[in-house]
Curated annotation (Swiss-Prot):
Quaternary context: Monomer.
EC number(s) recorded for this UniProt protein: 3.6.5.-
Listed name of the protein: GTPase Obg
Assigned GO CC terms: cytoplasm
Binding site for Mg(2+): S173, T193
Domain (OBG-type G): residue spans on this chain: 160-331
Length: 338
């Protein structure tokens, strides 16, 4: 199962309509002059970001998109109607690239702001345009110009304030379920989360932030292991990272080693990712073994000046304090400090 964050589509602007060859035919005028009108301009291809969309699924199902062509010119100097624009609404955060050259054509970081990606072809001129003193009855007109066409690759990077980072099955999906309206699929096996999930977390005083439940990473993710390339790409625009650890498996699994392995993957994929601020979250505090193991891992993080928040995504223990810390990271202060 793949998640929809990249799609290749073909877009074409509208062709211009052909000009018209026509002559006046009126009572008592035996040899009327040329009156062929111009063809209409083809429709443009326009892209615009919208917060109402969160995936590229619709374009994956309909990869060929075309604007309307201009209508034919007509007699009596009537111009053809313009072709209808093709307006593509895309999720905020979509990067548009030329599929052949990999050139970035647009980076839709804000909603609105429509951008003309391909211009429609010009309409052809009618024969009325070609009449001269020496050539009063031109019997030709221009064809319309063809529209532009292009193969595009659309990449969607999540626009989230907070990203949940960690090995598979450490409780990221459980946490985002607890604090937001998101309902990701949850089960006790690796790679349950097969696509990034977004949840809106309602904080105090009507404030909110977006949390991204990024699928679990494994060693070799920067080389694509476990779909790692796609997963890591979603972290690039996340403002703050929560690094979730499960210490219930000690000593069979070493959470410190897992923490270091993931940070190594971040650095190998993009050094700037490894520099992002992280808050350490120890999950599953409702289990007695986790309370016993907490003292064994705390010194490692304290020595590195990292804040550690013990929580239980199952019971809600410690989550209010964690949300206050997120608020401090995002806005500079928790609600009660304002």
């Amino acid at each position: 199962m793949s998640f929809i964050d990249e799609v290749k589509i073909h877009v074409k602007s509208g062709d211009g309509g052909p000009g018209c060859v026509s002559f006046r035919h009126e009572k008592f005028i035996e040899f009327g002059g040329p009156d062929g009108g111009d063809g209409g301009k083809g429709g443009n291809v326009i892209v615009e970001a919208s917060r109402n969309l969160s995936t590229l699924l619709d374009l994956r199902q309909h990869p060929h998109q075309k604007a309307g062509s201009g209508k034919n010119g007509m007699g009596k100097d009537r111009h053809g109607a313009y072709g209808k624009d093709l307006r593509l609404l895309l999720p905020v955060g979509t990067v548009i690239k030329d599929a052949e050259t990999d050139e970035v054509l647009a980076d839709l970081t804000e909603p609105g702001q429509p951008l003309v990606l391909l211009k429609g072809g010009r309409g052809g001129q009618g024969n009325a345009r070609f009449a001269t003193a020496t050539h009063k009855a031109p019997r030709f007109a221009q064809p319309g110009e063809p529209g532009e066409e292009r193969w595009l690759r659309l990449e969607l990077k999540l626009m989230a304030d907070v990203g949940l980072l960690g090995m598979p099955s450490v409780g990221k999906s459980s946490l985002i379920t607890k604090v937001s309206a998101a309902r990701p699929k949850i089960a006790e096996y690796h790679f349950t989360t097969l696509k990034p999930n977004l949840g809106v977390v309602a904080y105090k005083n009507y404030k909110s932030f977006v949390m991204a439940d990024i699928p679990g990473l494994i060693e070799g993710a920067h080389e694509g292991a476990g779909l790692g390339h796609r997963f890591l790409k979603h972290l690039e625009r996340t403002g703050h990272l929560l690094h979730i650890l499960d210490i219930s498996w000690m000593p069979d699994r070493d959470p410190i080693r897992e923490y270091e392995a993931i940070n190594k993957e971040l650095s190998l994929f993009n050094p700037e990712l490894a520099e992002k601020k992280q808050t350490i979250v120890i999950n599953k505090m409702d289990l007695p073994v986790v309370k016993e193991n907490l003292a064994k891992v705390l010194p490692y993080f304290q020595e590195r000046g990292l804040k550690v928040f013990p929580i239980s995504a199952a019971t809600g223990e410690g989550i209010p304090a964690l949300l206050d810390e997120i608020a401090r990271q995002l806005w500079g202060a928790a609600e009660e400090e304002w």
